[in-house]
């Protein structure tokens, strides 16, 4: 479902539980982003965010919690005794600040997917405020959204893939 949410200080475009190509989502942004500026009588966006989510199925692990917490983070038998309850989901969170070489602050969440035992849920939120974006330069928002998607496929997937091997390879 497509949602446009208008708040006093921001507009949020959401494609929730959507299996659409990124190009289709970018077309929606390209269409509505200039209109929002016009309706609000605002010359530019001072900042924008792009949040993209994906899931990855594991090849050699049937439980994403075991993969992330026990295998990747080496927490086997170290969590339960302290928290004394089962873990529904668990994972990692990284905050990657903007630099001269990389535009935008990225918040990366990698966790077990509660709807699929052997799947990893990934969310990357990019916050871009380096340059204001006017109606005639909406392409900047599209490029930054594409860069968030590229980060998932070119950085996170290979990062996880290096650990998704049979356990005996690491013993």
Language model segments and positions:
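Extended intrinsically disordered, low-complexity coil regions enriched in Ser, Thr, Gly, Ala
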Residues: 20-28, 38, 140
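Signature of extracytoplasmic/envelope-associated structural regions
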Residues: 2, 34-42, 75-76, 127-129, ...
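Aromatic/basic-lined ligand-recognition segments
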Residues: 47-125
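Short beta-strand-to-loop capping motifs
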Residues: 14-18, 54, 126-130
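Extracellular-facing segments of soluble proteins and assemblies that are Gly/Ser/Thr-biased and enriched
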Residues: 27-61
